[in-house]
């Protein structure tokens, strides 16, 4: 078969985010493994570009305060970013619309950013955050402004299943 005949075939595409996030499908879950690497690499790249050190350092010349890192999104990439930043000695804050993420974030030693109370209860679908209303997004941005203005590094990992990632900054 020639290359031109192969190119004319109709190719089938499947969105990898539609694979179920269950243990039986774990061997096919390439998104989680790639997200894990992305979260790790994001912190390493940020640390190499930052004009200061991540951990607190006490020297004869004085004390260098630890870097402050804000991670937006507490999924696979976000949790890996938290773990990596904490291992490097940073103070880490995390924002996610899913209340269940708070426990995971705190178990890694990060501080969870409490979002404003609204009538809408954001949730998740298949392990991903659901889309929220523009009103909620506006209130979320207002809450994050304080944390982001004090941060040395911001890592954005927030995703919505089947949609464009939310613009939080």
Model-derived regions: residue spans:
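Rossmann-fold dehydrogenase core element
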Residues: 9-19
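Short, ordered loop/turn segments at secondary-structure junctions
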Residues: 17-23, 97-99, 117-118, 159-160
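Phosphate-binding beta-alpha-beta segment of Rossmann-like dinucleotide-binding domains, i.e.
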Residues: 17-68
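Glycine/threonine-rich flexible loop motifs
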Residues: 1, 159-168
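An anion/phosphate-binding loop that grips the pyrophosphate of nucleotide cofactors and donors
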Residues: 151
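Glycine-rich phosphate/diphosphate-binding loop of Rossmann-like nucleotide-binding domains
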Residues: 56-147
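Single conserved hydrophobic/aromatic residue that forms the stacking wall/gate
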Residues: 1-7, 11
